C-alpha cells in the first residue's frame, strides 16, 4: 500500500517538476533551441518559451534589444531572468526602454540596462508587474526615469545601482528620477545606490493620482549627488544635478479621509544636495499627508538636511526620527506650515560647518506636536531641544567627532544620561537600549572603541571580541576591529551570503590587544565585489564570532 502511495505521489509531482527548465540567450550567432550549446539569440523567443518556474540565463555580451515580459510566473514558481556569469554581467543597451515588466512574479537579476540617454524610462514596471524582484542590476544613462513604476504592488528593488538620469540641463530644469512610483503598495527598496539624477533619487507619487500609494520601505540605501565627472546628455562636467534624495506627494482628495501613507526610511544615507539648481534643495523633502518613520538615517553636506512640511492643500507630514545622524548641513531642519507632528529621539546632530539647526518658516511647527528627547547637539543647543535629556556635546563625547564617528567615548557624559522612550528599543548599530540606562545620542556607549580606548562590560570579560564594522553601510571601505586578550592564531575572513569566501584580511599569529583592519570592498584577487550584504568572521583558537555588513556601490 505504501509503495502504491509513493508511486501515486510521484505521478502527481512529475507534471509540476517537468515544467522547470533553463533557457540560454546569447548576443551573437544564429538562433538556436535555447540550450547552453545552442542558445537563443533574442529575448523574445526565450520569454515565449519560459513557463512559471523557468530560468532564462543571459550569457555575457552586449544586447541591442530590449526585454519585454510575455507571461506571469506564480507564487513559488517565478520566471527568472538572470546573468549567467554575475562577474561578467550582460549589457542591455537600447535607444529607449530597455526593460518592461507587465506580468507578475518576475525576477530580473544581475543585468546592466543602459538607456543611451534616449527619451524613455530605462525600466518600466507596469500595473501587471506585481511581486517583481529587480536585484543586482545597474540602470544608467536616461533622460527620463531609471525605474518608472505604475500601480505595481509588492515589488522589491534590491542591491541595484541607478545613475545618470539626466533630463534637461542645469539652466533648463527637467525631472528625471532614479525611481518614481505611482499608486504602489508594499514597495521595498533595499541596498541601492542612486545618484546623478536631475530629479529626485526617489519620488512618490509625481502624479498625485489614484489609487493612493502606501507602505514604502527604503533601507540600507545611499542617495546622493555631486559634480558630474564628465559631460553627460546636456549636462556639463562639474555641474551638480538633483533636487532631493526623497520627495513625497499624495492626492489632495485624501486630505479629508483617514488615509495617511506610510513610508519608512531605515539606514538611508543622503548627501551632496548643496545650494543651486533649485531653491531650498534638501536631502529629505517630506511633505503632504504621509507618516514618515526615519530610523538610522544619515544626512550630511546638504543645503537642507530635512525639509519637513506641515498642512497645506494636500495635508501635512507626521515625522518620527530615531537614531539619526546629521552633520555639516547649511540648515539641519527647515520646518514649514505648522508641522503637526515632529518626534526626534536618540539622535546626534553636529552643526559642523552648518549655520543653524532649525529654520522655522510660515508657522514652523506646532509646539504641541514637537517632542525632542535623548539627542546630542554640538556647537549650540537649539530652543527646540529644551528637554533635560538633550545635551550640548563636544568632541569629548565621541570616539572621533572630527572624523564623524559619533560612537560614544567610554567617558562620555551621554552615557546613562537619557530617559526611557518606549519607541526606541535599540541604537544605530542594533545594540539594545536597556530600561533605566538609556544613553543620549544615536549610539549606546561601549559598542565600539577606538585605538587606545579601554573596554567595558561583557567585552572585558571575553577573551576575544569582534566589533561592528564602521561605517555600515559603507562605500568604498570600512574598518573592522577586534580584540584578543592573549596571543593567538587568528583568521578574519569575509564571505558572501552563499557562504563563499571573498577575502581573507588576517591569517596568522597576532599579539594580544586591539587590532584594526580595513576592507576596501575587493576580493582576494583585487577585484571590486558587487553591492550587497557580506558576513565577516573572526576565528581565534576555538572562538568564532560573525557579523554582517552592507557594501553599497
Model-derived regions, located:
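Right-handed parallel beta-helix/beta-spiral solenoid domain characteristic of secreted/periplasmic
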Residues: 57-60, 72-122, 133, 166, ...
Amino acid at each position: 500500500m505504501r509503495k502504491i502511495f509513493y508511486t501515486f505521489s510521484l505521478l502527481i509531482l512529475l507534471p509540476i517538476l517537468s515544467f522547470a527548465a533553463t533557457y540560454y540567450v546569447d548576443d551573437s550567432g544564429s538562433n538556436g533551441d535555447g540550450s547552453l550549446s545552442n542558445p537563443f539569440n533574442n529575448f523574445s523567443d526565450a520569454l515565449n518559451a519560459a513557463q512559471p518556474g523557468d530560468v532564462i540565463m543571459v550569457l555575457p555580451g552586449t544586447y541591442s534589444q530590449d526585454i519585454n515580459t510575455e507571461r506571469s510566473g506564480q507564487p513559488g514558481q517565478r520566471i527568472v531572468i538572470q546573468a549567467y556569469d554575475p562577474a561578467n554581467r550582460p549589457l542591455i543597451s537600447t535607444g529607449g526602454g530597455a526593460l518592461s515588466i507587465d506580468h507578475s512574479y518576475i525576477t530580473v537579476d544581475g543585468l546592466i540596462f543602459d538607456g543611451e540617454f534616449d527619451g524613455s524610462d530605462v525600466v518600466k514596471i507596469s500595473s501587471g508587474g506585481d511581486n517583481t524582484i529587480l536585484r543586482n542590476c545597474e540602470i544608467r544613462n536616461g533622460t527620463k526615469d531609471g525605474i518608472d513604476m505604475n500601480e505595481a504592488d509588492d515589488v522589491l528593488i534590491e542591491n541595484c545601482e541607478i545613475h545618470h538620469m539626466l533630463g534637461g540641463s542645469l539652466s533648463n530644469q527637467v525631472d528625471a528620477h532614479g525611481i518614481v512610483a505611482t499608486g504602489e503598495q508594499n514597495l521595498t527598496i533595499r541596498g541601492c545606490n542612486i545618484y546623478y539624477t536631475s530629479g529626485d533619487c526617489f519620488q512618490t507619487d509625481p502624479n498625485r493620482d489614484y489609487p493612493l500609494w502606501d507602505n514604502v520601505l527604503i533601507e540600507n540605501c545611499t542617495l546622493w549627488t555631486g559634480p558630474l565627472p564628465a559631460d553627460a546628455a546636456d549636462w556639463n562636467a562639474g555641474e551638480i544635478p538633483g533636487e532631493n534624495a526623497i520627495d513625497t506627494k499624495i492626492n489632495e482628495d485624501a486630505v479629508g479621509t483617514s488615509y495617511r501613507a506610510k513610508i519608512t526610511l531605515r539606514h538611508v544615507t543622503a548627501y551632496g544636495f548643496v545650494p543651486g539648481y533649485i531653491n531650498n534643495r534638501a536631502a529629505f523633502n517630506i511633505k503632504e499627508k504621509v507618516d514618515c518613520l526615519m530610523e538610522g538615517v544619515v544626512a550630511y553636506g546638504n543645503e537642507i538636511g530635512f525639509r519637513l512640511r506641515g498642512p497645506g492643500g494636500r495635508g501635512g507630514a507626521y515625522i518620527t526620527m530615531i537614531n539619526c545622524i546629521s552633520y555639516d548641513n547649511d540648515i539641519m531642519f527647515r520646518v514649514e506650515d505648522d508641522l503637526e507632528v515632529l518626534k526626534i529621539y536618540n539622535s546626534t546632530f553636529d552643526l559642523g560647518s552648518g549655520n543653524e539647526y532649525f529654520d522655522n518658516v510660515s508657522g514652523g511647527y506646532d509646539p504641541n506636536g514637537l517632542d525632542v528627547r535623548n539627542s546630542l547637539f554640538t556647537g549650540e543647543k537649539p530652543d527646540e531641544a529644551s528637554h533635560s535629556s538633550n545635551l550640548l556635546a563636544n568632541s569629548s563625547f565621541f570616539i572621533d567627532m572630527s572624523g564623524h564617528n559619533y560612537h560614544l567615548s567610554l567617558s562620555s557624559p551621554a552615557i546613562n544620561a537619557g530617559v526611557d522612550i518606549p519607541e526606541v528599543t535599540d541604537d544605530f548599530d542594533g545594540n539594545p537600549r536597556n530600561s533605566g540606562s538609556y544613553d543620549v545620542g544615536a549610539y549606546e556607549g561601549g559598542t565600539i572603541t577606538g585605538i587606545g580606548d579601554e573596554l567595558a562590560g561583557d567585552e572585558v570579560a571575553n577573551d576575544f571580541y569582534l566589533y561592528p564594522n564602521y561605517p555600515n553601510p559603507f562605500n568604498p571601505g570600512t574598518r573592522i576591529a577586534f580584540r584578543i586578550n592573549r596571543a593567538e592564531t587568528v583568521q578574519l575572513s569575509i564571505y558572501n551570503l552563499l557562504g563563499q569566501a571573498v577575502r581573507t584580511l588576517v591569517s596568522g599569529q597576532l599579539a594580544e590587544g586591539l587590532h584594526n583592519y580595513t576592507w576596501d570592498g575587493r576580493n582576494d584577487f583585487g577585484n571590486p565585489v558587487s553591492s550587497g550584504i557580506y558576513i565577516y568572521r573572526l576565528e581565534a583558537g576555538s572562538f568564532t564570532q560573525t557579523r554582517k555588513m552592507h557594501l553599497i556601490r
